[in-house]
Amino acid sequence: MTPADLAELLKTTATAVLSEHALDTSALPQTVVVERPRNPEHGDYASNVALQLAKKVGANPRELAGWIVEALTKADGIASAEVAGPGFINLRLETSAQAKIVNAIIDAGSGFGHSELMAAHKVNLEFVSANPTGPIHIGGTRWAAVGDALGRLLSTQGADVVREYYFNDHGAQIDRFANSLIAAAKGEPTPDDGYAGSYINDIAARVLQKAPDALSLPDAQMHETFREIGVDLMFSHIKESLHEFGTDFDVYTHEDSMHSTGRVDQAVARLRETGNIYEKDGATWLRSSSFGDDKDRVVIKSDDKPAYIAGDLAYYLDKRERGFDLCIYMLGADHHGYIARLKAAAAAFGEDPGTVEVLIGQMVNLVRDGQPVRMSKRTGTVITLDDLVEAIGVDAARYSLIRSSVDTPIDIDLALWSSASNENPVYYVQYAHARLSALARNAAELGLIPDTDHLELLSHEKEGVLLRTLGDFPRMLKAAASLREPHRVCRYLEDLAGDYHRFYDSCRVLPQGDEEPTQLHTARLALCQATRQAIANGLGILGVTAPERM
């Protein structure tokens, strides 16, 4: 019996109790919450449903809880139920009911934990979207890990997810990039507002390999040559780095296309139709303050050139016209103002601001022995995705970046995350999977097969804890997806790995020496098979490997 099954049983029982005592059944919440009590002595699960209902139906909470408990004790799978405190209900499950989660996991396999929670949603998930003027920095690397994990997570809950990279190839930063390449190709100092680092010299040299006469072209043509080839080379490197990191995108949208295809003009025309555009001081303004922004925004400047927000407006409209009912933007710590801005833009178009969600990521710092890690010589000013992967590997890099809530700054200790120790969270989880895999191989050599026919034998305290943690997996995924918090998967896996290690240390799974195999051995093998599957499923959502050997 999973927590979801138990919640449904509680709801059904409470409905019957309310009806029996002529109380209002409509007062029942849509979802009844069951939780694991902090003190295991209080039972396997607890619920406050009687406390929730009592005031609404005019009943004494302890009395109402008592009626529910009396009915629950007659239900299949309930070993005991009791009233605690002002009206809490504490429950213990029969071992056979609790162990049904093992069957559920083995039957579902890689689909265990999946649901149709978000099946009605077509989601555009835009993340990283770094300018093609340099390698992916550590902040963008955090989004590469978290965004990819979030996409996988939403997909497990039935969402139709499209991962999108918005290619910022329009604007002054691209011109500065081209000027930096030209200076490097000529052997001149980097312009004051240019980009520095050995990667600039590398790309400049490669531009000259592709266009040997580039420096002899007229200035405008030379600039365009370095701009076009340089951006293409830089973005190819970015995509290669992301791919090796395990992050790929379904769609790459060029910012420049919003302007060249007339999408910006179409967006402005639509806003004129809604009456949310006006002219002032020779510029065209969006009435964004009418929709929650702190001020109105210039869309077309007085020199008739589009402001940066013009591309954002066109891009949002483009997403909606492609059928996305949820547009998630994952932005850096310096983009807090974009939350109100993007929602105001949606409202100004006459769209639901709820179609826009903005996640803001905080800073990432690398440390070793408590000291900040110095900047990359290759890039001159930033630590890159490639630097982090070189230091600790892809799995540790992804896990370390996903493990904390995105609104929390994080310090990544390179010594810790590269260590083969239980203090390293990703090692701890992966080792549990490798240990389970070794156990399965050893069992096969002994001719033992996991057996789910005698799961009622799993009555040891540590087995019960492990079973309850396994039962939490589906609702953990639902919560993580609903809250857009893939870090919950990491924390769950660490709890599950810990519960497994403690179970393994207390409960012998395989017979030793001349000991004859028993039904308990094969039941425990089934429990281990289910645990291994749950860990593999969780690591898969994170884009982290589940090793067979370590």
From Swiss-Prot:
GO terms for biological process: arginyl-tRNA aminoacylation. GO terms for cellular component: cytoplasm. Transmembrane segments: none annotated. InterPro entries: aa-tRNA-synth_I_CS, Arg-tRNA-ligase, Arg-tRNA-synth_N, Arg-tRNA-synth_N_sf, ArgRS_core, DALR_anticod-bd, Rossmann-like_a/b/a_fold, tRNAsynth_Ia_anticodon-bd. It is found in: Cytoplasm. This is Arginine--tRNA ligase. PANTHER family: ARGININE--TRNA LIGASE, CYTOPLASMIC (PTHR11956:SF5), ARGINYL-TRNA SYNTHETASE (PTHR11956). The gene is argS. PROSITE patterns: AA_TRNA_LIGASE_I. HAMAP family: Arg_tRNA_synth. Its main location: cytoplasm. It comes from Mycobacterium ulcerans (strain Agy99). It is an enzyme of class 6 (ligase). The keyword Ligase applies. GO terms for molecular function: arginine-tRNA ligase activity; ATP binding.
